[in-house]
């Protein structure tokens, strides 16, 4: 019997579930370790659309032949029951450690080529207009190179350059130059906001990127305590269609405040924690609409769909959450607010105004953590209605 239990434990250690917060699903990875350091993974990701299942395959050679470099590749099919060529997502990544692990400023060089295709949160309708705005998809083919440095044990700096081809398409996979809007007679108006800087539906952009993270959080009986701050800058180089010169910057500050001292130990209860969060984002110059800040969504203002509150060049988000331990988990209450600071009208074509979005909104609610899942009842202040949501992972 003990042998069976040990075998089950070993199998569980090879099955790695984790949340896919971008596509609202769960990824189950199965890891196979071989003696020559090859890694192979495959998984299925059931999305919230129960008729669509994503399949993925990962191959790689970490620390190839002891040379401190690795090559990884992955292929993802958006729907394994109805595969299509333009739904095929791929990523190739090469990583090389530039310094020995024992050195205090360990540098890592990483270069990758990848593509993505996502629903744009900018070209969506506000309350009452959800069904009047056909979806718009943003596809990207990207080549990216970065260097990551550990400045200290708590500070990490990443900087690099990225080249992108961006194509916007409608739900019929046709290249679309403008956002769409259904007219009362059932027809489609194509005189919406422009989807790209070039006005053709296709952009080519080169960007310098840098971000610095300060993270001094720690675990106290399983509860996160401390601070995590992130500052990120994206600088357009003027290379590409219409010579795009822009600066996009954002600062995120999150504090996890321990409200009560507790004895630390594996079987000891978690302390109550107050989480305070703030995020500011700003843009200067010719930023394309697909890269402006979208207000609303599980990682912006909970209770609203992604982009439901607006798309803006400048935003401010504030949030607070108090976590109270209950046995092996915790319950929590939260409140959040997002505001476009009056900058929605500065986005080309003003999609926030055209699609009847508010430009600001608040929410509050209660939740309980159930393993990896958060069950939340959220009240959307703008609508005066509430709903139950299931989310994966942590909000902060």
From Swiss-Prot:
Written domain comment of the UniProt record: Transmembrane regions consist mainly of membrane-spanning sided beta-sheets, which are not predicted by sequence analysis tools.
An annotated GO BP: protein targeting to chloroplast
Bilayer disposition of the protein: Multi-pass membrane protein
Quaternary structure and interacting proteins, as annotated: Part of the TOC core complex that includes a protein for the specific recognition of transit peptides surrounded by a ring composed of four proteins forming translocation channels, and four to five GTP-binding proteins providing energy. This core complex can interact with components of the TIC complex to form a larger import complex. Chloroplastic protein precursors also interacts with these complexes.
Disulfide topology: none
InterPro entries attached to this UniProt entry: Bac_surfAg_D15, D15-like
Function comment: Mediates the insertion of proteins targeted to the outer membrane of chloroplasts. Required for the import of protein precursors into chloroplasts. Forms the voltage-dependent preprotein translocation channels (hydrophilic beta barrel) of the TOC complex in the chloroplastic outer membrane. Required for etioplast formation and/or etioplast-chloroplast transition during deetiolation.
Protein name per the record: Protein TOC75-4, chloroplastic
Superkingdom field: Eukaryota
């Amino acid at each position: 019997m003990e042998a069976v239990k040990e075998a089950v434990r070993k199998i569980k250690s090879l099955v790695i579930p984790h949340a896919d917060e971008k596509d609202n699903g769960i990824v189950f990875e199965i890891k196979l370790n071989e003696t020559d350091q090859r890694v192979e993974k495959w998984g299925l990701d059931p999305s919230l659309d129960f008729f669509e299942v994503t399949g993925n395959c990962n191959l790689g050679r970490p620390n190839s032949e002891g040379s401190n470099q690795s090559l990884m590749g992955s292929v993802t099919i958006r729907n394994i029951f109805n595969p299509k060529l333009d739904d095929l997502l791929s990523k190739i990544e090469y990583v090389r450690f530039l310094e020995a692990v024992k050195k205090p400023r360990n540098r890592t060089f990483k270069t990758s080529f990848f593509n993505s295709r996502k629903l744009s949160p900018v070209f969506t309708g506000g309350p009452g207009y959800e069904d009047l705005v056909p979806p718009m998809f943003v596809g990207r083919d990207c080549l990216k190179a970065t260097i990551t440095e550990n400045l200290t044990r708590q500070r990490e700096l990443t900087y690099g350059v990225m080249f992108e081809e961006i194509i916007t398409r409608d739900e019929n996979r046709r290249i679309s130059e403008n956002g769409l809007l259904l007219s009362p007679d059932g027809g489609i108006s194509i005189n919406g906001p422009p989807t790209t800087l070039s006005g053709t539906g296709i952009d080519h952009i080169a960007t310098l990127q840098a971000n610095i993270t300060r993270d001094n959080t720690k675990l106290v009986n399983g509860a996160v305590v401390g601070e995590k701050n992130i500052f990120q800058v994206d600088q357009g180089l003027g290379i590409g269609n219409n010579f795009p010169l822009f600066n996009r910057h954002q600062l995120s500050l999150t504090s996890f405040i321990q409200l009560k001292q507790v004895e630390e130990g594996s079987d000891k209860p978690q302390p109550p924690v107050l989480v305070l969060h703030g995020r500011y984002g700003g843009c200067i110059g010719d930023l394309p609409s697909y890269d402006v800040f979208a207000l609303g969504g599980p990682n912006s203002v909970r209770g609203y769909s992604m982009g439901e509150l607006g798309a803006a060049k400048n935003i401010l988000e504030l949030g607070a959450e108090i976590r109270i331990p209950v046995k092996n988990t915790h319950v929590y209450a939260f409140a959040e607010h997002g505001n476009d600071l009056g900058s929605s009208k500065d986005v080309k074509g003003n999609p926030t105004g055209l699609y009847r979005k508010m430009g600001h909104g608040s929410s509050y609610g209660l939740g309980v953590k159930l393993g990896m899942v958060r069950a939340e009842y959220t009240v959307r202040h703008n609508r005066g209605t509430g709903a139950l949501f299931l989310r994966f992972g942590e909000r902060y």
